Amino acid sequence: MGRTSPSVEGANDLLEVQVSRIYLSCMEMVREVERDLWEMGINVEVQSMQDKQARFMTKEVRAYSFSIVPSIAGHFDVGDMNRMVDYVFPNSTVVEYCEAEIKDRTSEKILNPGNSHKVRNQVWSEFLHDGKFAYTYSERITPQLMTILKELRDKPGTRQAIINIHSNFFMTPGSWSGNPDVGDELDLDRIGGKKRIPCSMYYQLMRRNEALELIYTMRSCDYLTHFPVDIWLAIAMQEFAAGWLGLKCGPFHYFTGSLHAYEKDMKARGIF
């Protein structure tokens, strides 16, 4: 059977799906991503945001992806990464936050609330309940990290080196974090504004061409609050893993189901 032509509405929807680009720097990437969002994003109203049940207007692009290649030396320029963060958060301490957070994530200690939130308290304080967060990346990464790195060391061709962040499956209390005082729950039970759930789905690490690549998959990302931070931290994780394995870095690959910005934040920047 011949392929039927999409409806006008369907064709318009297809236009929102972007072709993946390859960038030579984080700064080049963050500017182009911003332009794509402002010029090609569509207005979408959502009914909850993390642990808030309320209506919010956003601008969104879907199924968005890109890659960034490292330098010829096989590493990403930290100065370039920092400039990317400063581009979205000028005159702030967000780079300092990133530096503290990657230490929490790679400390091999299960930390909640950890240390980094103190640097960016204006964002994170509202999510603290009885002195803890609903989850931390440290809690979710730490029990997996060394096992994944050893697998990459012993089986260079593996496609199974995935560090899961988001989890819809059930675990007994404490089994995810390794801490019996931390009650684990289904992320599925937290949806709809009940509690925070991770925007990140997983990191996939792959050894190819004598270098370590990282594929970062997210369900959702807020450009004006978290995007450059998430990219900085993922690349820093790639550098950490490459260093542990004695490898150079290969390309960094990114995909998100929804890249968006909230009307309230865009108005503050004079955009919406």
Would you name each region that the model predicts?
Residues 2-272:
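Terminal, non-catalytic protein-protein interaction segments that mediate quaternary/complex assembly
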